[in-house]
Amino acid sequence: MANPSVKTVTIYLIEDDASQRDSIESLLVYKGYIVKSYSAANNFLKNVPFERPAIVISDICLPDISGVELYQALIEKNINIPIIFISGEASIQQSVDAMKQGAIEFLVKPFEIDELINAITKAIHIELKEINLNLLIENLSPREREVYKLLLKGHNNQELIDKLHLSLPTVKQYKSEVMRKLNVKSLSKLIELSK
């Protein structure tokens, strides 16, 4: 996959109110985004898998399942993409629940256009960072991926030696290769990159 850019990101919009959906879609298309819109979560879920890079903008209150349930369904399908929730009738608890699930932003209608664009920009940045990291990880050998995953879990050299049945020089070599291929200079930068 070539390096994706901001304008190649598909925005999936799930909004049951037709006038709201059309208004948001028109605005985003005018701004140059690729938008695919749906009136219900299940209609959207039927189209999985979909193109990446992508982000989702979803109303919390949908006719079939809630926006949070939609996001949980995506996670269950191993589709972890940034989501922005919108709602005209949001409670504080809904907002908290959405953010705990991993929402990038929770906007209450009516929201300012700048609020939406800022949330989209943030979500796209997160999505592109994730895709670029995945491209780098694809360049790791299977053993380097094992080392990478263990490093992210906080394992030290001795634990890597024990778990992977390798010598200290070999562990150090794998760590060095992982950091070189992921273009980081320190373990803390490796962990930061993967957040």
PLM features: residue spans?
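C-terminal output helix
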Residues: S91, F111-I120, E159, K163
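Two-component/phosphorelay signaling modules centered on CheY-like receiver
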Residues: V9, D17-K36
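Active-site residues of response regulator receiver
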Residues: D59, S87
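The feature encodes the CheY-like receiver
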Residues: P63
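Short amphipathic alpha-helix used as the core "switch/output" element in two-component signaling
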Residues: V68-N80
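Acidic catalytic/metal-coordinating carboxylates
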Residues: A40, S66-E69
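Basic, Lys/Arg-enriched C-terminal extension of HTH/homeodomain DNA-binding domains
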Residues: M179-K195
